[in-house]
Amino acid sequence: MKDKAYDITIIGGGPIGLFAAFYAGLRGVTVKIIESLSELGGQPAILYPEKMIYDIPAYPSLTGVELTENLIKQLNRFEDRITICLKEEVLTFDKVKGGFSIRTNKAEHFSKAIIIACGNGAFAPRTLGLESEENFADHNLFYNVHQLDQFAGQKVVICGGGDSAVDWALALEDIAESVTVVHRRDAFRAHEHSVELLTTSTVNLLTPYVPKALKGIGNLAEKLVIQKVKEDEVLELELDSLIVSFGFSTSNKNLKNWNLDYKRSSITVSPLFQTSQEGIFAIGDAAAYNGKVDLIATGFGEAPTAVNQAINYIYPDRDNRVVHSTSLID
């Protein structure tokens, strides 16, 4: 069955893509968001969910999670016009009659215009690389933490030795029943002060050990098997939740296959965010132009212009005068 053609498809479900989708909904067009990750929010939600952001207009400070929650709440006003596709990576798109055919790793989509808001490319968590890991993912195996309270009273095992792993371990110390950190080296890569706090905490530290296997029933992991580096010693750690904090890898390899003009790793755009291909626009960190400032606030400002230009491209004969939101929403 052929997928219906949406007015605008937004590639990327980070802050800029979410706001662009909201604004497109405000303008009364249909929107599809295609996001490579299993959740919306992009880097703020994934890489620094609990860290404070200070340069969002009208917010003295808010966390990455709070920013994402606010954007999704704003977006939900137009949920009848917006479709969200998660865990889909855009491979190619081609001009077809009436718009574009967009091929992902899962499906083929159709859109009258495209707005690229994928930042520096698709990014994904670095995994343990163990058999059956995917089976436990998002059940009780996590690659990032949004709500610390979900681990209350649990036996939590954290794999990793960077800032996020150490920060989560310290934050969970007084929430979880127990916290164990497994790191492949004796030395941690986190901030010195954080490491000092960790070594004097009640967190169990197992170094240098590497994960070897996961055991569980159904979608729930129950034990992590670890082995001491360069030794035969093997331990089985009982757990209620496992947090893997190996960081994220980014890739813009597909972006380079989209037959657009590029400046380094970004897409060259006009002052109206038009790419070298008519009907395709780019905003946020994905877009390159002289004087560009790579801030979330900058991308928020770019989104309405790109959406309005996309609507002008799709419906050139329509009265496309921009109306303030105070006149559009009761």
Curated annotation (Swiss-Prot):
The keyword Aminoacyl-tRNA synthetase does not apply. Binds 1 FAD per subunit. GO terms for molecular function: ferredoxin-NADP+ reductase activity; flavin adenine dinucleotide binding; NADP binding. InterPro entries: FAD/NAD-bd_sf, FAD/NAD-binding_dom, Fd--NADP_Rdtase_type_2, Ferredoxin-NADP_redctase_2. It comes from Streptococcus pyogenes serotype M28 (strain MGAS6180). It catalyses: 2 reduced [2Fe-2S]-[ferredoxin] + NADP(+) + H(+) = 2 oxidized [2Fe-2S]-[ferredoxin] + NADPH. This is Ferredoxin--NADP reductase. It holds the Pfam family Pyr_redox_2.
